[in-house]
Amino acid sequence: QGTGIMVGSPGQNTDHLVEDLLFIEQFHPEMIGIGPFIPHHDTPFAACLPGSMEMTLKLLSIFRLMHPKVLLPSTTALATLAPDGRERGILAGANVVMPNLSPPEQRNKYSLYDNKASLGAEAAEGLQQLEEKLTVIGYRISKERGDY
């Protein structure tokens, strides 16, 4: 089972994040998805600021300490906030990357938020570029099952 939180949602404060930490603790999840809020132009939150990179990284680190074996993705949303966001997520404690392998001409049909990070390459090229970026920070991609 999995669960997660969006960091920096409009109206969210630190007390809410602490409540989320404690709430998630009850589930003993196998995967926890944590990513920053990023506004989409077609929503009531279009003019809102995105969530904080630093707070998202702190929460990744906290969840890693609380759940040493959990599958913890470094999200595309982190890479949308900063070019090295995905790598920073890994360094903060994430252990999963989920590259966008959709063909570039199809990606606009699935738009969760504006300016979504993409390596802009074909699926195989994008995976190779991601592997190279992670190698620079001392990690490698395993294509094995990521069982809990």
Per-segment meaning from a language model:
Residues 4-7, 15, 33, 71:
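Conserved mixed alpha/beta catalytic, RNA-binding, or beta-rich assembly cores of soluble enzyme
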Residues 2-12, 39-46:
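Active-site-proximal beta-alpha loop/turn segments in soluble metabolic enzymes
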Residues 25-148:
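Auxiliary Fe-S-binding modules of radical SAM enzymes
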Residues 6-20, 76-83:
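Active-site glycine- and acidic-residue-rich loops that bind
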